Amino acid sequence: MNSNQKLISFDLKAEMGFFKKPDINDGIYLTYNMLHKPALLGILGAIVGLKGHEKEGVLPEYYCKFRDLKVAVQPLASDNGNYTKEVITYNNGIGFASNEAGGNLIVKEQTLLKPSYRCYLLLNTNDETEKRLYENIMSYRAEYIPYMGKNEFGVWWINPTEYSEFKVFHFNRDFKISSLFRKNEAVSKYIVKSSLFLFAKRDEKPTFIYFEKLPVGFNEEHFQYDYADFVYSNILFSKELTVDDSTAFFDIGDSQIIQMT
């Protein structure tokens, strides 16, 4: 690897989180379960001091700077990829709420409880902003207060780690993927059948597979999310698994494979 490339990870934690979906169900604003790339880039922007959304129809500074950054996300302390959610009701008596009956707007939001994610970044320290991001993460420093999707859901991080021995994974053996990964087709035909078991064996966890369609970036013409299908699983996959050419798989040691998008 280029000596100026650094692969690091850090564990993001919050008491609550809300990654707003564009749709509403029975009057409730829904949240994505997983931390997606656009939301992560916003957190990175806060850490390094880049500006956010300021003007309608203009992409935020942090997104313009980090859109091509390779990242990976691994859920922590989840129930097979799922986090506990609770619907919280807010009363809004200002602004547009004055047009509502009684002058009070009731907002209901599905909220993640105690979400935590290990975030991997592939940084180029020749770039001044990425170098500053690296230094801030490793020293627990942020220019602005980062949050888990909403201003009131402050986030902190622990366990910043640098991987000195990481290498490109060449699909020369069967493997498990520690992070979320993008799928191009059904992954079921690539499962190593002998790795499947429904009940725990000794210290092993029952196998599971979790799917979610997540934002991967912004459509710059319509200023809406672009999406991709993601998988999170502890299943062993065969080396014939097909992957998106725009992504990169890395072996970071201790039999851990991650996909960076």
Regions found by a protein language model. Name each.
Residues M1-Y29:
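N-terminal, Lys/Arg- and Ser/Thr-rich interaction peptides
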Residues Q5-L7, D68-K70, K114-R118:
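Extracellular structured ligand-interaction cores
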Residues D23-G95:
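Glycine/small-residue-rich interface belts in oligomeric ring/scaffold proteins
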Residues E15-F18, L50, A77-D79, T125:
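Short loop/turn segments at secondary-structure transitions that flank enzyme active sites
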Residues D11-K13, A72-Q74, Y120-L122:
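Residue-level recognition of well-ordered beta-strand positions that form the cores
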Residues L76-T261:
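Internal, well-folded beta-alpha domain core
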Residues M1, Y62-C64, Q110:
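Sterically constrained small-residue positions within well-ordered secondary structures
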